[in-house]
Amino acid sequence: MHLESNDLAGGLSDERFNFVTSGLADRDISQRFSDKEKSELALYIQQAWENLHQDAQYRQAEILSLTSENFTWGKYPDAEAYARVAQHRQPVTNGKHDTHLYASVNLEDSDDVLATQTILLHLQRPNTILGTAYFPYERGDRPEIHADGSQELILLNTLIMNIQHSGVRGLIHISPHSPAFPWFCLKAGIAPLSLSVIPGLIKEAEKQGFLDDTVITANSDDGAKSSRQFLTNYLECGDSINGTKRKETGKTIVTYTEEDFRKVRNKTVIFTEDIISTGGTMASSIFQLFNQGQAKRIIILATYPIFAGNALERLGLDSRIQIITTDGRTPMADITKSNYVTVIPVKDKIPKVLELDKQGVNFWSQTGKEKLEELGLSIFPW
């Protein structure tokens, strides 16, 4: 999977271009990635993955589950974290840091990252390709400036640098739609592989009979535009709408044009969302598309479920609204009793992707794409 110089877009002409010394590495992270930057980033990701796999020792590496009886972690009653390693589980390296490892893990929060980092340090920092359905704070891409002048700091970058120090050289994860996550990985010297669950979510929608010949795709803000375009192409539907999101006095408002309302009339509208958090964004879209647009049905394909606070009530779910999401994160509300939320498994797909990678599957090849799609996955469409 070598990138020839004529394959490189956006002025990239060197066959072995270096992300760290590129202009893209120095971009202002407070700004959204442009389409051109996303295209360049995708090439850097592919090149980094190729460079990582020039080391043939990964073909003989052990695939280890860090979520098993050999490794446990959690919290003491005082909420402090702990990590334990089974007595018989010895370090996998000889002290020279030249051992290679595939490790699958189910991360939920920063304590899980700390435990993973500590376990890898205990194993004497093997050169690790880590696979996880979720990586904490991976949506933290733009530092927000508040009304009082204070600025949000990005916690994600610190976590990524920490796991790189513990030996992580490659990271396979389910993408939350933010190109900032692989950007931070590349900055830290980690080759990222960002995967999308859209194929699996669509298959579930088809299985449940939610799709028909009057489908139109939608997104509620520019952040999901790339995934909406991927969805449009995947479904081969010719039309889509693009909402504009803004926040006013604590409320999220999504606006659509009269032309958008005309397009959705009597149609099934399919959204792609990174998460369902408080439900504010989707509630605004749902209200308008049903009341002003006269949409027939709304299907929400969400990478992660959160359902914080009264999100379920705010969304006003009924038979016209269906949410399909994954088990990549644990929701804050009990969604098992909802007739309008379907959860598909994705955590169990990560070890299978690691196995394919160990076998030398090129995920950018036609064969690699087909094998990912069999798992309900695809390379994320930046």
Residues covered by each model-derived region:
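PRPP-associated nucleotide enzymes
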Residues: 1-382
